A protein has these predicted regions:
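Generic low-polarity alpha-helical segments
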Residues: 17, 21, 39, 45-53, ...
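Alpha-helical transmembrane segments that form the membrane-embedded catalytic/substrate-binding core
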Residues: 92-96, 130-163
Length: 223
């Protein structure tokens, strides 16, 4: 648990609301609302699909004991470490930046606008994604499961290559993790993502390889 990342973690809701507000200001209430509804329908789809997994398993981790502080207490009371595989935090931030990447192009935003806002949305998506481990205290398995789910249910927005890029950028600028540990973390996430992608390629239900993995997984239990 790394309290310094709490503010970033708590930006999760504001992260996907800010672009909605921007659409309202740019296009007006009528058109801006249509674009916002389009995004919210994707959100709804993601939550419905993730719910199907959570009826099977709510979490794969035990939260380790952390130094007591108000920040720790507030986060752990308000946000239990459930909804783990796939992580909705990862799903939503990746959906957000990929949706608006598509929308900025479709709605004829200028090249400068697209470059600036795509860069900002992506960088914050990566930062919030990292806090899933720093603050939420999921296992690394929640990340590849989320990326895999998105490639299956929103392939028009989120591709396997986008998932690989996201994985490669995780913890790139972190100073509290050794280079060796960064490599090990990212390599494992990449391995799990590719495994799920390959095993799910011929399945009608994207959940099949995730459930297969869950059935064989034994979580680490802190002593």
């Amino acid at each position: 648990f790394t309290p310094v990342h709490i503010d970033c973690y708590l930006d999760f809701i504001n992260y996907w609301i800010r672009p909605i507000v921007m659409m309202q200001k740019r296009f007006g209430i009528k058109q801006g609302s249509k674009l916002s509804i389009e995004f919210l329908r994707y959100i709804k789809r993601c939550y419905k699909e993730a719910y199907k997994m959570y009826t099977y398993s709510m979490t794969t981790t035990y939260r380790p004991k952390c130094p007591e502080s108000r920040a720790v207490t507030n986060v752990q009371r308000a946000d239990p470490h459930y909804l783990c595989v796939p992580s909705l935090h990862i799903v939503v931030v990746c959906l957000c930046y990929s949706f608006y990447r598509m929308l900025f192009k479709r709605e004829s935003f200028t090249q400068q606008e697209r470059e600036q806002w795509n860069s900002e949305l992506y960088a914050q998506a990566v930062a919030i994604g990292e806090t899933v481990l720093y603050v939420k205290q999921h296992s690394v398995n929640c990340i590849p499961a989320a990326l895999y789910m998105l490639t299956k249910i929103t392939p028009e927005l989120f591709t396997p290559q986008m998932a690989v890029n996201f994985i490669n950028d995780l913890f790139k600028n972190s100073t509290d993790i050794t280079d060796a540990d960064k490599k090990e973390i990212n390599s494992y996430i990449q391995f799990m993502f590719e495994r799920l992608l390959l095993e799910g390629a011929l399945e009608d239900d994207w959940r099949v390889p995730v459930i297969r993995w869950l059935d064989s997984y034994k979580p680490y239990e802190p002593q």
